[in-house]
Amino acid sequence: MEQAARAAGAMLQSMMMGTGMLSKGFYEKYGKEALPIITDVMSRGGVETGKLMQQMMPVKDMNDIAERFKMMAPVMGLEMEVVESSGDVFHIKMSRCPLGIEGTSLELCEALMSQDANMIGTALGQDVEMKILKSVAVGDKECEIIFSKK
């Protein structure tokens, strides 16, 4: 079972990197014109993932979201620090980008991260605001993101 979990984690990592590479290539070719399309696609994917999360691992608040992220981080090979977790706020730091968009732009980061914001919002059944304080996409040493209920 442990070997299967590691294999699943490696496949998830590869899929996320593939999403990042595709988005990065699209962004490099079409510039800012690509951002609304990337945001739309990622947002819709986040909604679908949020529906699955709510069915498989129901959440009530941001504390539950933090627990789900903490559970998934090692599977994804990520080092994640939960800075704050309350009923209304989930604040994290990560040492690397699971999408592999280092050296791109904050706008691309925001477009891709719309998936997480929409996943969380859908799972909670309410709108969620996302603030990206730091991003390796723009050369920061870590990513720092705050998700909060609106």
PLM feature segments, named:
Residues 1-91, 95-111, 126-144, 148-150:
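N-terminal accessory segment detector
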Residues 110-124:
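Active-site helix/loop of acyl-thioester processing domains in fatty-acid/polyketide metabolism
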